[in-house]
């Protein structure tokens, strides 16, 4: 039986708490959150012991696994404390504030022998897995162009931390990081990035809130991604991509039914995808839990088998942080930046 402690009971924490109930051999035993109303809800919903901070929960002991779902600036210290205390760690994305903190987390995992996995969930999302398989297999020929989009309204979070770059806010870092990670997972690290965007106050109003990034690989194909946190309240969160191949086109749009279509003949086809396992009521800007459950299943399966995660390694998650940080640098320098 894996005894799990959860740091953070906001929208992501609530989602993970719901899904942790679905596993055999896994028991959520404690939840930490600075907000009294969140602790009251955690006690009422799950009957667990609650703590005002994650540090105290970890220090109290009795845990096998810690899930970290707090603002990004707290990821590294909590993950390192948990692994040092003998716990395996599942940490939500982004991995940490910068590559130095990521490296410290990786060093702690190696020193303690504990498993560290980062929640880059698109690697478990059926529509993105389908695209990666198509690129790898060359079923539709060589990739010619890929464009990704992830747009929605403003997120604020506890104490408006999503609007504060110094605490890991800014949509380019917290939301667009999904598509950056997907690009690296499917295509590897580009030679350079060129990013431009609209900016507000980085401490109080979200910093780079709308960006477009070009990932430069070669002259053979083009890759770009758009991210935003500026749509009006009535506009639904939207994630989509369009991938053009030599012999076909794959299009995903989270707002359409079916969400995925392949154009490689006289008429489009909708590939059969795994059914989502549950609806979430956590306040997350998605409606289904399948990919989040899948990454949990994979994490616990790795723990049971005594193997390290390969779908998303800590080193891969650190590389995503390096590239996103370079995108931010590119936005502010208004020029393309080479990735060594």
Regions found by a protein language model. Give the residues of each.
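C-terminal helix-rich "cap/oligomerization" subdomain common to oxidoreductases
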Residues: 65-67, 218, 298-340
């Amino acid at each position: 039986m894996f005894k799990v402690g959860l740091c953070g009971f906001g929208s992501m924490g609530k989602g993970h708490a719901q899904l942790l109930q679905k596993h055999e051999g896994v028991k959520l035993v404690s939840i930490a959150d600075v907000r009294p109303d969140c602790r009251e809800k955690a006690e009422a919903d799950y009957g667990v012991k609650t703590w005002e901070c994650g540090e105290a929960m970890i220090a109290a002991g009795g845990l096998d696994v810690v899930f970290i779902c707090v603002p990004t600036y707290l990821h590294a210290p909590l993950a390192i404390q948990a692994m040092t205390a003998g716990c395996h760690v599942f940490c939500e994305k982004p991995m940490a504030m910068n590559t130095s903190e990521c490296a410290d987390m990786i060093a702690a995992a190696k020193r303690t022998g504990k498993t560290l996995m980062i929640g880059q969930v698109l690697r478990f999302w059926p529509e993105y897995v389908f695209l990666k398989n198509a690129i790898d297999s060359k079923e539709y020929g060589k990739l010619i162009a890929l464009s990704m989009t992830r747009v929605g309204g403003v997120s604020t979070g506890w104490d408006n931390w999503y609007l504060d770059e110094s605490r890991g806010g800014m949509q380019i870092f917290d939301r667009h990081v999904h598509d950056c990670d997907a690009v690296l997972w499917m295509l590897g690290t580009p030679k350079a990035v060129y990013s431009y965007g609209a900016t507000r106050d980085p401490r109080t109003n979200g910093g780079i809130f709308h960006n477009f990034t070009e990932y430069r690989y070669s002259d053979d194909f083009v890759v770009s991604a758009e991210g935003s946190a500026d749509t009006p309240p009535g506009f639904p969160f939207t994630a989509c991509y369009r991938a053009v191949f030599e012999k076909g086109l794959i299009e995903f749009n989270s707002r359409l039914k079916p969400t995925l279509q392949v154009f490689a003949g006289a008429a489009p086809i909708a590939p059969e995808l795994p059914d989502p396992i549950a609806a979430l009521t956590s306040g997350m800007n998605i409606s289904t839990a399948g990919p989040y459950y899948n990454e949990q299943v994979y994490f616990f399966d790795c723990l049971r088998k005594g193997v390290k995660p390969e779908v998303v390694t800590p080193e891969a998650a650190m590389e995503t942080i390096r590239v996103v940080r370079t995108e931010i640098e590119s936005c502010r320098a208004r020029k393309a930046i080479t990735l060594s």
